[in-house]
């Protein structure tokens, strides 16, 4: 466990990681990027996602795949896929919510979603997280 001495206290909304890589919000101080990379032993980059600083709120990934805000551009999706080492698909959760982390719990064994998640969303999530 590593404690980051930062003013940000909701790091889960600012960071998306798996065992292969991580995307960190530009609002996280640069001095912590190397610490995060070293502690988790992963490659880490700093970027916004679909114009949002809350990277962890608009992306969710495990070691098999991931989903991202539907307004993310293709170039960013390719870059994030490379860093995380998995395929990432645009998706929504809970009948159209683009903040995918608000309704998804995921690890490499299973994915749990909110009860408002509809059939097409479940199909997208199944495809995304079982690549």
Regions found by a protein language model. Give the residues of each.
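The feature marks the mature, well-folded catalytic cores of soluble enzymes
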Residues: 1-131
């Amino acid at each position: 466990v590593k404690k980051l001495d930062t003013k940000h206290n909701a790091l889960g909304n600012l960071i998306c990681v798996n065992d292969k890589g991580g995307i960190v919000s530009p609002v996280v101080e640069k001095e912590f990027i190397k610490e995060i990379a070293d502690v988790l032993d992963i490659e880490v980059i700093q970027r916004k996602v679909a114009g949002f600083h809350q990277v962890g709120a608009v992306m969710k990934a495990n070691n098999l795949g991931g989903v991202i805000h539907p307004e993310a551009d293709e170039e960013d999706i390719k870059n994030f896929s490379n860093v995380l080492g998995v395929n990432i698909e645009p998706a929504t959760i809970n009948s159209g919510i683009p903040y995918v982390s608000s309704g998804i719990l995921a690890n490499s064994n299973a994915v749990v979603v909110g009860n408002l998640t509809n059939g097409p969303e479940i199909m997208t999530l199944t495809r995304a997280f079982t690549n």
